[in-house]
């Protein structure tokens, strides 16, 4: 059965998701990023609303004073006030928006993702058949549903709010500065409603995009088998790996820290391991020559190992015995005497 005729009923493996992430294929939620940025901006306006209100009130009051001043002086004062108002409101607002976009993108993408793969030319992007296929996909249906939801819910919420404030807005020119605080209070309420609605919509979109992405990344049984085969290799390769692991497991652990008796000769050091009930005969677990022998000797001293000076036996063991193997039978007697003297046998 071919891959095209099989049903993609299995979830994507971690390897497939990791490879897709390296290619820049991740669930993207632009609504969540926009909602986070908008909430940051609205939150800033909410927290700094009183300061902005005072600045705007000051600008409106200054308008009457500027009418009686010479034109050049009036323009200069108006520009100074405009710059102060911009720095006090727009500057922090842009910083909040920029920071929120970066943070929301990192949260939505679960870290920083950089890939040039999406920028490469792809014929499928301009293929009309692929476009028609995407048009009838579940993702397109979800996008249409999201658009309708935003239009109906957000539009209805804002409409109800404006209906409650329409009388205030109508009498605002007559009311003058006395209604200025009412307008800002209403604006804060509108900000709170809008921020809450946008954030909820962004979180819902984030969950939807992840669910759709995992749905698109589903695999067939054949794809899973192929991936497993690529990871583990052919049966022959797996058998060879198993054989090497078994050989390594059967070999005794080596190193001076495994030794119980050390023989030292001229520029030669031999380490043997013999533990009653564990090893039937002494095993050669370490050996060194030259500078390495000096380093190993100091390490053996630090480990408080029994050290025997025997130049002849040390050189004989060095030339006749391999690491991890038992000592030859002809050396049993002198080594047994050393073990007895050290209280190891």
Curated annotation (Swiss-Prot):
**Basic and acidic residues biased stretches:** 1-22
Q: SUPFAM superfamilies under this entry?
A: EscU C-terminal domain-like
According to its UniProt record, which protein family does this protein belong to?
Belongs to the type III secretion exporter family.
Q: Name one GO biological process term.
A: protein secretion
Topology in the membrane? Multi-pass membrane protein
- Source organism per UniProt: Sinorhizobium fredii (strain NBRC 101917 / NGR234)
Designated name of the protein = Probable translocation protein y4yO
Q: Which residues cross the membrane?
A: 87-107, 151-171, 189-209
Query: What Pfam families does this protein map onto?
Result: Bac_export_2
Q: Name the InterPro entries for this protein.
A: T3SS_substrate_exporter (IPR006135), T3SS_substrate_exporter_C (IPR029025)
| Subcellular location(s) of the protein | Cell membrane
Q: Where is this region: Disordered?
A: 1-25
Superkingdom assignment: Bacteria
Role according to the record: Could be involved in the secretion of an unknown factor.
Keywords per UniProt? Cell membrane, Membrane, Plasmid, Transmembrane, Transmembrane helix, Transport
Its primary localisation, in coarse terms, equals: membrane
The GO cellular component terms are:
plasma membrane
